[in-house]
């Protein structure tokens, strides 16, 4: 049965030919399905070190594939030492899921702005006399 997935994988920063490895991994996903969207996010910093590395090449693929193709992708990704991490989401199971890397980036900026506003938020200081006047009204 073909389902919709969002697959993200991180490649080692020391990989010489990332395009070749990306095309190999994408071919595995497309073997029993089709790739709807493929986004290369480039070399990004990790939040914490993974295998003594501080950076990696991020790649996101939105694909319609069978579970067999996904399992085969995960198996090969575990074997290949150049693949640092993988994440596979079955987007059909997530309610109100919007599949777009561009949207994800804008959502993160909105989230960061909200957090900044919360961090800088202070209750306004109201003198007791003013508070008593407001309560009596």
Curated annotation (Swiss-Prot):
One BP term from GO: translation
Pfam family membership, one: Ribosomal_S6
Lineage: superkingdom: Bacteria
One Gene Ontology CC term in the entry: ribosome
GO molecular function: small ribosomal subunit rRNA binding; structural constituent of ribosome
Keywords of this entry: Ribonucleoprotein, Ribosomal protein, RNA-binding, rRNA-binding
PANTHER family from the UniProt entry: MITOCHONDRIAL 28S RIBOSOMAL PROTEIN S6, SMALL RIBOSOMAL SUBUNIT PROTEIN BS6M
Function: Binds together with bS18 to 16S ribosomal RNA.
Family per record: Belongs to the bacterial ribosomal protein bS6 family.
Name of the featured protein: Small ribosomal subunit protein bS6
Gene name, Swiss-Prot/TrEMBL: rpsF
């Amino acid at each position: 049965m073909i389902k919709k997935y969002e697959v993200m994988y991180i490649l080692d920063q020391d990989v010489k030919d990332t395009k070749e490895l990306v095309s190999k991994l994408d071919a595995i996903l497309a073997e029993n399905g089709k790739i709807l969207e493929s986004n290369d996010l480039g070399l990004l910093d990790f939040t914490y070190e993974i295998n003594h590395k501080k950076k990696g090449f991020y790649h996101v693929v939105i694909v319609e594939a069978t579970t067999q193709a996904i399992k085969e992708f995960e198996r090969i990704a575990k074997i290949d030492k150049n693949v640092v991490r993988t994440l596979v989401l079955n987007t059909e199971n997530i309610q109100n899921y919007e599949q777009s890397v561009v949207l994800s980036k804008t959502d993160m900026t909105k989230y960061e702005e909200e957090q900044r506003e919360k961090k800088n938020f202070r209750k306004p200081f109201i003198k007791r006399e003013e508070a008593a006047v407001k309560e009596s009204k």
